Amino acid sequence: MRDKLNLLIFFIAALLIALGLRFTPTISFAGLILLLAVVPALMLRFRDFFSREAVIAGIFVLGLALNALIGVALAYTKSMEFGMSLLSLLPLTLVLTANVFATSLVIRIDASGKEVFAFYFWFLISVGLAFLFLLPTGGSAEISPRGAGWFRFVEFPILYSELALIPSAFCLVFQRVRTFLFFSPFPLFLDMSWSSL
């Protein structure tokens, strides 16, 4: 019964996100919160699936491709509405996908359910707090910032790779979840120089 409830919440969240892209970001945000809550439970339910090497590699490649496409689209779009819709997808493609990839590696080293939940939510909290330091303070951010398209093509994939790989590297080297909880926000601080470009 709990598995069916988690799946139902997952599909409701996906529907809210889709509606939010069409109508208002507030709906999309509500869907994102629901989605974040049920993802780790579903990953633990399908533990064997998410611990496969092919699945883990596929999640990583999917995140790279999605973030590259969004980066290029943001660089060239002239529509404010379309640009805002793309920006509303970034929490999913940039943070959630990286978190699912890293959490899959945690599952692969046979971490307990409590450790998986602890890592998943600590990843979200630490990355969210780190992003606060990178938010523009001038109030004049552009949907299509100045800069070459090739730079936008690599910017989001590089940031995504840092979010996904740096915490995961500590997980694989030390085979302990608690050893890299401290390092989860570290990739964002590396990118402070990017925000000034």
Curated annotation (Swiss-Prot):
It is found in: Cell membrane. Keywords: Cell membrane, Membrane, Transmembrane, Transmembrane helix. It is a multi-pass membrane protein. The chain crosses the membrane at residues 5-23, 27-46, 55-77, 87-109, 116-138, 153-174. Its main location: membrane. GO terms for cellular component: plasma membrane. It comes from the Archaea. This is Uncharacterized protein AF_1579. It comes from Archaeoglobus fulgidus (strain ATCC 49558 / DSM 4304 / JCM 9628 / NBRC 100126 / VC-16).
